[in-house]
Amino acid sequence: VSAPPATPSARPPHRLGVHVTDAGVDVAVLAPHATAVELCLLDGPPEAPAERRVRLDGPELGLWTASVPGVRPGQRYGFRAHGPWEPARGLRFNPAKLLVDPYARGLVGELGYGPETYGHVVGDDLVGDPYGPADPRDSAAHVPHAVVVDTRALPGPDPAANRPRTPWSRTVVYEAHTKGLTHLHPDLPPELRGTYAGLAHPAVVAHLQSLGVTALELLPVHAFTSEPHLVAKGLTNYWGYSTLGFFAPHAAYATAAARAAGPAAVLDEVRAAVHALHEAGIEVLLDVVYNHTCEGGLPGQHVAWRGLDNAYYYRHLGGVPAALDDVTGTGNSLDFSRTGVVATALDSLRYWADVVGVDGFRFDLAVTLGRSHDGYRADHAMLVAVASDPSLGHLKLVAEPWDVGLGGWRTGQFPPPFAEWNDRFRNAVRSFWLADPGRAAHGLPGHRVRDLATRLAGSVDLFGHGTPPLLRGPQASVNYVTAHDGFTMADLVAYDHKHNAANGEQNRDGSDDNRSWNHGVEGPVTPDSPAADVAPLRRRSIRNLFATLVLSAGTPMITAGDEIGRTQQGNNNAYCQDGPISWVHWDLSDWRANQLATARHLLALRREHPALRPHRFYSGTPVREGGPRDLAWYGADGAEFDHGRWHDASIRTFQMLRVAPGTQDDRVLLVVNGALAAVDVTLAGDADRPWRLAWDSLWEHPGEGATSGGPPHAAAGDVATLEPLSMRVYVLA
């Protein structure tokens, strides 16, 4: 059925997507190899939509455009792309398939998993030859429909206008899942649990504020789908790293009322949540997935980019258009050597920054975004464009500095102003506190303390180079011990091995390099268990891990629930677990309440002491003429570390003395004992500047410091006995 006649679009050709005008909509879609593209206006029930088609003009520089009168917000639509079906040339045009607009601001409906959603012929088992004939069945009733959303004058306050703009040196990141964080929260009304609105509920805000969190980093909230193999097992993609649209919020996280009102209401709910979090002083960072899409490899579904122009949007192996180059482990990788792919990612980032008001982004598998045909480049057009963009360059930009392609591990190699997830920090902390003691218990050697010391000091070996050197500073190191993928902190101390049977892959999925230690017993222990004596040791190990994270130079990232001892029952790859395994449980036993108090106390120490959060890398030189050095290292005997000690793997005890210049020269002494035996430590420092014990990892609750009966103050040269696998923090009295 024909629609109102279209006219050539007069708006700038780079403005892709469907945009509302006074007369109707302007339309533009990028499909350089297509021979024709139609805008399909959809009415009636989604399971049997009536369709009006508008043929777009083009291609001009690969763009297909039109101005279509009479189309209003709320209109459902999609595209159909015409062209050759020649899989050997990478051309997979099939106009029987309704395609999702990559620029859609809203989506309704669910992706189906029948044969109709495939471009090539497949059987009921969804298996077929991707190089075989095109499938003639229409997919309009089996795919989500894009929805026209008017973003010209949005209701409510502007979330981009009240950004907290927390400096990196004061930033504490809290990585959370939109649903999982609040789905079981007892203080939220049922209708808000697991929603965008729930994130901004006063109970959630109060928890984040009391903890000391300054930035809430959300796992993907771009519209996403579940992989067919998960659906066949009755599972879903819980994390959301399977993007269907880079602009539309994932509607399932909205309240039922917003979903019923439509995509505009979903967008309003997201913006309102961001604004409310800003009012509370909390920034919002988004985990964004531009490296691949939900379409999988060539045997996968045909719902958007593959149908618009498979040969253009995706990387191809060795330049052979028939084969996809998978550097992401998902079956496909977007090709960031293409101007249009770079433009799509930039437009999406600007939309979420300017319209939704978020404060930054964590880029999943960011190396893919910096890949040219000859590999990763720190001066890649995408990275330069983000860094220099007036809407983006001043935001918090965090790279996951790897992908699975050749030369894909690039920690420390992203340009300013990017910060990076520091996997070397994670590995060093886990090794020192868990893997090494586990080995030592069996008479095996561990790592030298220099690795942990380097991470405590901000990882200058990774982030101190560049032109000019030392430009980024220690804040570029996003330090973490756990993240969404892998064991939780409580599971790191309770499991030697992953327990992923619930994922339906015979425990083959998930990493085997966990550097965990179960303290002699696999899994949970109860008070009446014969192994109950390992429980306090595990709790101490959690405190050691958390303290090392929070007290290190750099930007700490906490995984939601670690502050209250969340467990995933040993599952270290809970990407498909939308249920109790992954959700945060808010019922606090005594030890979990103590862990929360400890987390709050440690983060308060970080906040109160500039020596723990330096702007620049430590130099080991005086903070001023005649003053103390900004960093010094000492052994258990109180003598300074020399070259030999750094290389002696038998040494497991050290002291780290840090000083921040100021009127009182803020000083913090960290004393670490990673040995399996108690060690007497001669405290470092100046004789005329006594210490106060601010925290001891032996304390189940930080309040024990006031009731321990020990001396409240200590002087340099005094001897303190550190119990096995423990640490202390001293501040000036």
Write out the residue ranges for each language-model feature.
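Conserved, mostly hydrophobic/aromatic
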Residues: 29, 79, 176, 218, ...
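Substrate-binding/active-site clefts of carbohydrate-active enzymes
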Residues: 139, 177-358, 365-391, 408, ...
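Hydrophobic faces of well-ordered beta-strands that scaffold small-molecule active sites
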Residues: 172-174, 216, 284-286, 361, ...
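Short conserved micro-motifs at the rims of enzyme active sites and ligand-binding pockets
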Residues: 185-188, 408-410, 490-496, 500-501, ...
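Conserved alpha/beta catalytic core and glycan-binding cleft of carbohydrate-active enzymes
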Residues: 372, 378-560, 565, 573-577, ...
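Short catalytic/ligand-binding loop motif for oxyanion handling, primarily in non-cytosolic enzymes
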Residues: 86-90, 157, 182-184, 224-228, ...
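Short, flexible loop/turn elements at secondary-structure junctions
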Residues: 31, 58-60, 70-72, 83, ...
